[in-house]
Each structure stands twice: as structure tokens, then as C-alpha cells.
Amino acid sequence: MMSCYDRRYVHTPNLDRIASDGVRFANSFVANSLSGPSRACMLTGKHSCGNKFYDNSTCVFDGTQQTFPKILRENGYQTAIIGKWHLESLPTGFDYWEIVPGQGNYYNPDFINMNNDTIRKKGYITNLITDMSIDWMENSRDKKKPFCLLIHHKAIHRNWLPEIKNLSLYEDK
């Protein structure tokens, strides 16, 4: 939720600024309302019936399918994904990835890296994913190549938990 849509519930000045400087969609749709299947649709360009990823609990994404990161990579782009994957498989078609297994945790979350090691990182997941993404862009990518970085945040998923310092932000509302 963003206050540029309804100011009664939240205060989001930075997101509101981005919305006022860019495009804000008042009527938009997704191919699937669940995060994993929706992500599979975006990656493949196919509906769930075509990519065979129907739900968040019984499906495993078939990484042999064509995806837009694979096409970009084949055409000289450096590709990366950092954050929530939730496709019950490991990413394919990326030069770099570090993903949150399953739904992930808001506080001190685990990440799986390209060596298939699970590493617990201390902090709030939004800040960690953001900082890891900035670090990859500034320090790890090949600056001679165009790039595509998918930054998949957890914090848009229930249950919604803020950073510890913001837990009392709306106590009086």
C-alpha cells in the first residue's frame, strides 16, 4: 500500500515521490495472483498453463524453459537476481544470483548463493536485498556490459513486518 493511492493508512513519501515523477497504474492486472506463479509467468512470458508452475506449494519451476534473462544473457547482457525466488528450484540463466529460499524471513533471513550454500544474514530483509543489489551493481558487475538485475523484495508479502525501528510507527492509528 502506498499513500499516493490512499492516505488514510500509511505514509510513504519516497514511494509517492517516485509515483509522481513516473507512471502510476490505477488499473493493472497480473497473469497469476500468487507470487511464485506470477514470477514464472514474467520470466517465461507464458501463462501458468504453459510454464506449468501453478501454485506456491506443489510446483517446481522447470529451469530448462526459455526465459527473458536467458535471452538477454545470450545477447551480451550480464544478468543477476537478488532476493525472493520462491520457485522451488535454483535460478538458471543468470550470471549471478543470491536468493531467499521459500517465503523467507523478515529478520535475519537465509540466502542461498551460487555455491548452493545457505547463509544467514543479520538484518532486515529489505535493507539486505537493497544493499546486496547496490553492491552487485557498484562492485561486482562487468561495467563494460549492459545488465539486467532483478531485485525481488520479500516485504510486499504477508505477514507484513516492518524494520524493528519502525514497529511503533502506526501505534496511534
Identify the residue ranges that each predicted region occupies.
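Formylglycine-dependent sulfatase
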Residues: 1-173
